């Protein structure tokens, strides 16, 4: 049996390991000193401690990961998402070390990871926002004046929504330019940055692609709407997008497939676009499995990790485009260990974690358990809740019920935000964009009324809490999470996440 080293941590390791076992591969894992009690270790047949706590000591340390793969005699290396997943140097080290990298080739990663080169290729197929790479402040000021403010300053080799700065004035640019170059160098290994026209409040829509260079077969699995974001990082995704007509969807998919064919893409990846006033703008290529891949799996019935393994192992991409039929609607909520108002990471120990069991309408991808101490060194993602239904309305209701049955205590989480977001009229009507969070209403002017309503219903559910001091009324009163669109009070579930 062949071994697959999953060079990552947390829920994505568990997700990949389950498919490895299903297909007859042996999943192997790594863990840091900070992750010695992590749940993903138990889902791997073999594991190795690669030491350290900070990412550059372990999950970003190519030499330690390659050494671990050799010690466990692995055949494949799956990078998951984040960390080294889109690093062309890592893919090359894997290949040079005699391992099969489960992802695109070194050359494709080099192209797709360079935002300037990727835009050059895409510009022959799809509209792109005006801009270019800049090396000096005076050059950047001249370009920004030419294309007009606001502009966005990005790391040329950046990704994952990190290091982006929207700038409204020349003073903003002067303050940010050198800082951005330093951040780009420390985070992505290159201080190169580029400036482009900032498209304000667009919708963010991506297309899931599978490619097999051995047969030149490129197919799509539909689009995903990813417009609800904080700090340019996604919080809620859904498929299909409510923004698209059949005509605009066909155009979007045609452009995405053509771009991936042009670069001879191999394995799983996505092409991301901004959508504003009926026009698409190419954004970037994500050359890895996405955090939100599960909603595509729910509507298509296709295991994307299985396809990755089939392609990498030489079995090939056997799916035929005309036989892929998406059914229903799916939503994903990313539950993070964060303050739900400021989205500030809040590591700590989970006192209690209760989640609904997976069923035909709800899927939970998580590495959380009661008593787990969340390390402060890594991403704040705790769990992904995926709901599906025959239509969007049913999928939303299934997600609401799942959120209200969750229990995470001991640390703050973004569950109150998600419940509130799913009750927002803009989301319910599918007419939202990337400014969604900035314009959310928290009803802070009705604190007294909401607090009174809570106290009225408190005696009925008091058995859910042992200590009344655990109830944070400020948190409860700031959100309209406890009211559905018809105004019914959700008192039955308040105490499940009141603290």
What residues fall within each predicted segment?
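Short loop/turn segments at secondary-structure transitions that flank enzyme active sites
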Residues: 227, 291, 337-341
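Catalytic cores of soluble metabolic enzymes centered on carboxylation/carboxyl-transfer
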Residues: 256, 296-297, 302-499
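N-terminal beta-alpha lobe that positions the nucleotide/phosphoryl donor
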Residues: 1-271, 275-290
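Short, contiguous acidic/charged loop-to-helix segments that flank catalytic cores in large enzymes
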Residues: 243-247, 295-300
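Exposed boundary/loop context
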Residues: 3, 73-75, 156, 182, ...
């Amino acid at each position: 049996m062949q071994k697959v080293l999953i060079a990552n941590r947390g829920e994505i390791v568990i997700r990949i390991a389950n498919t490895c076992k299903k297909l007859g591969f042996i999943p192997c894992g790594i863990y840091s000193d900070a992750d010695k009690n992590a749940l993903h270790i138990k889902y791997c047949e073999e594991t190795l401690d690669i030491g350290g706590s900070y990412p550059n000591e372990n999950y970003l340390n190519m030499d330690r990961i390659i050494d671990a793969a050799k010690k466990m005699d692995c055949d494949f290396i799956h990078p998951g998402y984040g960390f080294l997943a889109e690093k062309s140097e890592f893919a090359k080290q894997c290949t040079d070390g005699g391992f099969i990298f489960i992802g695109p080739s070194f050359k494709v990663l080099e192209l797709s990871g360079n935002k300037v080169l990727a835009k050059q290729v895409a510009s022959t197929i799809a509209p792109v926002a005006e801009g270019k790479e800049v090396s000096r402040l005076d050059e950047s000021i001249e370009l920004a004046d030419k294309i007009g403010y606001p502009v966005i300053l990005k790391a040329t080799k950046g990704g994952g929504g990190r290091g982006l700065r929207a700038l409204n004035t020349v003073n903003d640019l002067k303050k940010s330019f050198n800082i951005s170059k330093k951040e780009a160098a420390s985070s992505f290994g290159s201080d190169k940055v580029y400036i482009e026209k900032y498209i304000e409040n667009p919708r963010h829509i991506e297309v899931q692609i599978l490619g097999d260079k051995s047969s030149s077969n490129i197919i799509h699995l539909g689009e995903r709407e990813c417009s609800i974001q904080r700090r340019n990082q996604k919080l809620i995704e859904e498929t299909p997008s409510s923004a698209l007509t059949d005509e605009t969807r066909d155009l979007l998919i045609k452009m995405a497939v053509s771009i991936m064919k042009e670069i001879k893409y191999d394995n799983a990846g996505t092409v991301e676009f901004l959508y504003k006033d009926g026009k698409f703008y190419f954004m970037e290529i994500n050359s890895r499995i996405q955090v939100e891949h599960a909603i595509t799996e729910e509507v298509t019935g296709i295991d994307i990790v299985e396809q990755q393994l089939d392609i990498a192992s030489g079995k090939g991409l056997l799916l035929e485009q005309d036989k892929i039929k998406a059914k229903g609607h799916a939503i994903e909520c990313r539950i993070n260990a964060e303050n739900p108002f400021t989205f500030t990471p809040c590591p700590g120990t989970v006192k209690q974690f209760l989640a609904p069991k997976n069923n035909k309408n709800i899927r939970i991808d998580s590495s959380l358990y009661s008593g787990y101490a969340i390390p402060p060194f890594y991403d704040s993602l705790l769990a992904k809740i995926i709901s599906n239904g025959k239509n969007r309305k049913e999928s939303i209701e299934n997600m609401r019920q799942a959120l209200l049955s969750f229990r995470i205590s001991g640390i703050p989480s973004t569950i109150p935000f998600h419940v509130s977001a799913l009750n927002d009229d803009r989301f319910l009507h599918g007419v939202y964009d990337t400014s969604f969070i900035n314009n959310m209403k928290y009803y802070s002017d009705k604190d007294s009324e909401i607090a009174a309503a809570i106290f009225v219903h408190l005696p009925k559910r008091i058995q859910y809490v042992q200590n009344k001091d655990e109830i944070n009324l400020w948190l409860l009163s700031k959100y309209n999470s406890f009211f559905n669109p018809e105004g019914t009070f959700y008192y039955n579930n308040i105490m499940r996440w009141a603290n």
